[in-house]
Design a protein with these regions (language model features):
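Hydrophobic/aromatic-enriched cytosolic interaction surfaces used to assemble or bind macromolecules
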Residues: 1-145
Length: 145
């Protein structure tokens, strides 16, 4: 998956854009969808919309200034971080356990110089009570949407 600003996007080059960041087979289906809130095209391979798209589509609806939205399916973390109306980070990570999820989220926040103690983290996936307790040690608030 890749997000390409509309000013650089050419539909005929969608496969090339994607091939620069992920390995795709020659016969893989490549799709793109315009995301007006970012003035960019979300490009992905396969017939199923990736969870990261849903994260990005919903990120702007969060009321907080520092927006942290995650989806974790037990294997992959989809993470979107925004500040105000700006998208700061959009990525996926292999995360087989919740400690790995925490690592990637906190690393991203550190690299963006955002203070988790002043931020609400939101998940679009269910969390165990133990996972929520762990999050409350680092974040001002935890929300499951």
């Amino acid at each position: 998956m890749i997000l390409v600003p509309s000013s650089f996007y050419n539909e005929d080059c969608a496969r090339e854009y994607l091939a620069q960041v992920v390995d795709i087979s020659k016969d893989a289906e490549v799709n793109s969808v315009f995301m007006p809130q970012y003035d960019a095209y979300f490009i992905y391979s396969g017939d199923r919309m990736p969870e990261l798209y849903r994260v990005l589509a919903r990120l702007g609806t969060l009321p907080e200034y520092n927006k942290i939205l995650c989806h974790w399916d037990g294997e992959t973390l989809s993470l979107g971080i925004g500040q105000g109306k700006s998208l700061l980070l959009s990525n996926t990570y292999k995360a087989g356990d919740f400690v790995s999820v925490m690592y990637f989220v906190l690393l991203a926040l550190k690299s963006l110089q955002l203070n988790p103690e002043m931020s609400t983290i939101c998940f679009m996936s269910e969390l165990s009570s133990d996972d929520k307790i762990l999050l409350y040690h680092y974040f001002k608030s935890v929300s499951v949407l």
